[in-house]
């Protein structure tokens, strides 16, 4: 494929400009003869998770297509599922720029985007226009200006609007780039949020006559005891799945590299071992009670197999997709 040449050009640009240009071009080619440039045939490796049939276990993680603008073009690349978002009730511009940095030598990224998105209504409108027939996950969050005490209301608003269009809903309570968001991951505030989400899910199931599973996306920056406490709560509330993990604020493996001192969440290869260990701990604790979607640093067949050996049923990529392009999807799935 042409991706090595495309990457060479894109990596001359500011990372966020390169991202915007990529989204624009993918949007432009969808449904045209030019879609053949990204379309590839991958083997079927069927798996069932959360009651959903996936054609293969490799998905695109949230964050790349926040507004659902290029679902069709991404779907042509062979992903087993696509997760769009994170989306919030109202549009927001996110944090100040620059807010996205490449750690090229480490095959990593640091972002402090801050849930920049055009709002849930815009996302729904884009989904309605798409022709993607695969599994679609929708990742939801809270607006920055919503007080943390009222944060659950934002999740419930988003749930109601995306429910008819989602195959599963991912609840993002682990981004390090929205003030206080990670406080939703423990104690009474988590208990309250999960109860409200499950109540809403039951009402929406009755109204729409379909059950849409809920998965919670967690941080890697928790102690083992915090992880176990969270797992207990997720099981107690009958949450359908857990996405492990989001980005890390740790810089242990990238110390001294260009941009490593930038604040935000670190993703890509430096996150690989950390996220795999979280999956291993969760898998040991959960004993199959809750499926795990593994994400963080998967950039090869070997690292994909490591995630699954640790206990993940499904896996996702994002940063490695930026570095290696669509060919990585085929390389992983073909021998997984």
From Swiss-Prot:
Pathway: Pyrimidine metabolism; UMP biosynthesis via de novo pathway; orotate from (S)-dihydroorotate (quinone route): step 1/1. The active site is at 175 (nucleophile). Keywords: Cell membrane, Flavoprotein, FMN, Membrane, Oxidoreductase, Pyrimidine biosynthesis. Transmembrane segments: none annotated. GO terms for molecular function: dihydroorotate dehydrogenase (quinone) activity. Its cofactor is FMN. Gene3D superfamilies: Aldolase class I (3.20.20.70). GO terms for cellular component: cytoplasm; plasma membrane. Binds 1 FMN per subunit. It catalyses: (S)-dihydroorotate + a quinone = orotate + a quinol. One of its GO terms (biological process) is 'de novo' pyrimidine nucleobase biosynthetic process. InterPro entries: Aldolase_TIM, DHO_dehydrogenase, Dihydroorotate_DH_1_2, Dihydroorotate_DH_2, Dihydroorotate_DH_cat, Dihydroorotate_DH_CS. CDD domains: DHOD_2_like. It holds the Pfam family DHO_dh. FMN binds at residues 62-66, 86, 139, 172, 217, 245, 268, 297, 318-319. It is a peripheral membrane protein. It is found in: Cell membrane. Substrate binds at residues 66, 111-115, 172, 177, 246-247. Its EC number is 1.3.5.2. Catalyzes the conversion of dihydroorotate to orotate with quinone as electron acceptor. Monomer. Belongs to the dihydroorotate dehydrogenase family. Type 2 subfamily. This is Dihydroorotate dehydrogenase (quinone). It comes from Baumannia cicadellinicola subsp. Homalodisca coagulata.
